[in-house]
Design a protein with these regions (language model features):
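Active-site phosphate-binding strand-loop segment of PLP-dependent enzymes
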Residues: 1-55
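A generic "structured core" feature
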Residues: 37-40, 44, 63, 148-152
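Conserved core segment of the aminotransferase class I/II
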Residues: 68-139
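Residue-level signal for well-ordered alpha-helical positions
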Residues: 23-24, 56, 66, 102-105
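Short amphipathic alpha-helical segments and helix-helix/interface helices
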Residues: 30-34, 60-64, 99, 149
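Conserved glycine-rich beta-strand-loop-beta hairpin in the small C-terminal domain of fold type I
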Residues: 122, 139-149, 159-166
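Short, conserved active-site loop motifs that form the nucleotide-linked donor/cofactor pocket
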Residues: 42, 72, 160
Length: 166
């Protein structure tokens, strides 16, 4: 598609634990994707809400960490690793033009994230080790995942296929 059209202005991807499939891109796929992105110089939004919640297997590099041309805009959120429903996230880019446009759009949408949510998050980050917290919630989530998989295996007909979330 990239070779045959000039209409592609941006690509949005979730390479880690894509919802609803739970699929994760392999390292090889990430590398090939970045080769294409660099060749055609297409901006990419990498949405990574679940990246910190890997239960098994090895962590894979983000596309942003593989980005040599500043084409990847990385999005993260506190709602999956700190508090569900919390509407605080972050944007990582060194492209000032992109960040300026994002700021403009954000202000047009809601001016700012809740001040109370920001203060709660700030206090939590000052008082706690975020990595240790993530490990605690992963222990809870992996038990829930295992219970869900067990129930699905016991209940669903064999024709039903599903992924084993990592």
């Amino acid at each position: 598609i990239l070779a045959t059209t000039e209409n592609v202005k941006m690509i949005y991807v979730i390479p880690d634990f894509q919802n609803p499939t739970g699929k994760t891109w392999t390292l090889e796929r990430r590398q090939k994707f970045m080769e294409l992105i660099n060749k055609y110089e297409i901006p990419v939004i990498e949405d990574n809400p679940y990246g910190e919640l890997r239960f098994e297997g090895e962590f894979l590099p983000s596309l942003k960490s593989m980005d040599t041309k500043d084409l990847v805009i990385f999005l993260g959120t506190m709602s999956k690793i700190f508090a569900p429903g919390l509407r605080i996230g972050w944007v990582c880019s060194t492209n000032a033009e992109v960040l300026g446009k994002y700021n403009f759009i954000k202000q047009g949408a809601d001016l700012q994230s809740s001040t109370i949510d920001q203060l709660i998050t700030n206090q939590f980050l000052e008082d706690n080790d975020l990595d240790a917290h993530v490990e605690k919630i992963k222990a809870v989530y992996v038990k829930r995942r295992d219970a869900m998989l067990k129930t699905m295996e016991e209940t669903f007909p064999k024709e039903v296929k599903f992924t084993h979330p990592e």
